[in-house]
From Swiss-Prot:
InterPro entries named in the record: GPCR_Rhodpsn, GPCR_Rhodpsn_7TM, Olfact_rcpt, Olfactory_Receptors
PROSITE patterns named in the record: G_PROTEIN_RECEP_F1_2
Any one of the GO CC terms: plasma membrane
Designated name of the protein: Olfactory receptor 4D11
Keyword Transmembrane helix carried by entry: yes
Keywords tagged on the record: Cell membrane, Disulfide bond, G-protein coupled receptor, Glycoprotein, Membrane, Olfaction, Receptor, Sensory transduction, Transducer, Transmembrane, Transmembrane helix
Main subcellular localisation: membrane
One Pfam family from the record: 7tm_4
Protein task: Odorant receptor.
Length: 311
């Protein structure tokens, strides 16, 4: 088929999470609560780290960046999902779909690289405590965060540059609630076997290997902590377990979605909801509920902002 004779699809239709109006209302209320809590939780982390001088350390500087990413990442999909749950016709233009894919992979890639930077920070703090302040200076942290965003940008450019030349001339129905490579790729009017293999290698294989690398890194860190003594050991172990939990919650759904052939499975929508909406909510909960220093800083900030709390 010659691409010049192909009529390009101008919009895609989502089947969404459910076809039932009652279920749509329940899901809307639930996901709206989750999204608002995600925004407030991550915003609270950003404000606390910014306003509390005791938290002006590399670890919290990186945590604030992760909170920014979580707000942006969830906002890429959640508002559209909420709108569609209240709409009979769930459509998205071709341009908006490609834009959503670009932002989704930019922020998702930056998130993965940022989690790697946080693992590096944790390793430096434990293995080289005397040189930690020098190695993880404010300038170095800024450079690492910038590199994380740039890595996400490059990853996203690769994804979108592979998709844009493809012809979309026939079916335009997506059995999902957001635009992503696996779903959109199945609607093209050409053979995508080689491209699918390339994207599985680029997304799935790299993500799996990166996840294994991070787990090995944290295992080394925990083994290093076993030989140390002192009051900081428990705090370091708590920090590491929080990191491991967040890494697992982020990577496992990614591996499920991208490290297999792009065929629809019954559990795909549930995993996608966890990946796109639930995970950004859990990150602030994990980092704050297990972190006494963060909770103390939030209480101090509350006393400063609410006059009655000072009494």
């Amino acid at each position: 088929m010659e691409l010049g004779n192909v009529t390009r699809v101008k919009e895609f239709i989502f089947l969404g999470l459910t076809q039932s109006q009652d279920q749509s209302l329940v899901l809307f209320l639930f996901l709206c609560l989750v999204y608002m809590t995600t925004l407030l939780g991550n915003l609270l982390i950003m404000v606390t780290v910014t306003c509390e001088s005791r938290l002006h350390t590399p670890m919290y500087f990186l945590l604030r960046n992760l909170a920014i990413l979580d707000i942006c990442f969830s906002s890429t999909t959640a508002p559209k999902v909420l709108l569609d749950l209240l709409s009979k016709k769930k459509t998205i233009s071709y341009t908006s779909c490609m834009t959503q894919i670009f932002l989704f992979h930019l922020l998702g890639g930056a998130d993965i690289f940022s989690l790697s930077v946080m693992a590096f920070d944790c390793y430096m703090a434990i293995s080289k405590p005397l040189h930690y302040v020098t190695i993880m200076s404010r300038g170095q942290c800024t450079a690492l965060i910038s590199a994380s965003w740039m890595g996400g940008f490059v990853h996203s450019i690769v994804q979108i540059s592979l998709l844009l030349p493809l012809p979309f001339c026939g079916p335009n129905v997506l059995d999902t609630f957001y635009c992503d490579v696996p779903q959109v790729l199945k609607l093209t009017c050409t053979d995508t076997f080689a491209l699918e293999f390339l994207m599985i290698s680029n997304n799935g294989l790299v993500t799996t290997l990166w996840f294994i690398f991070l787990l090995v890194s944290y295992t080394v860190i925990l083994m290093t902590l076993r030989s140390q003594a002192g009051g900081g050991r428990r705090k370091a172990i708590s920090t590491c377990t929080s990191h491991i939990t967040v890494v697992t919650l982020h990577f496992v759904p990614c591996i499920y979605v991208y490290a297999r052939p792009f065929t629809a499975l019954p559990t795909e929508k549930a995993i996608s909801v966890t990946f796109t909406v639930i995970s950004p909510l859990l990150n602030p909960l994990i980092y704050t509920l297990r972190n006494q220093e963060m909770k103390s800083a939030m209480r101090r900030l509350k006393r400063r902002l609410v006059p009655s709390e000072r009494e």
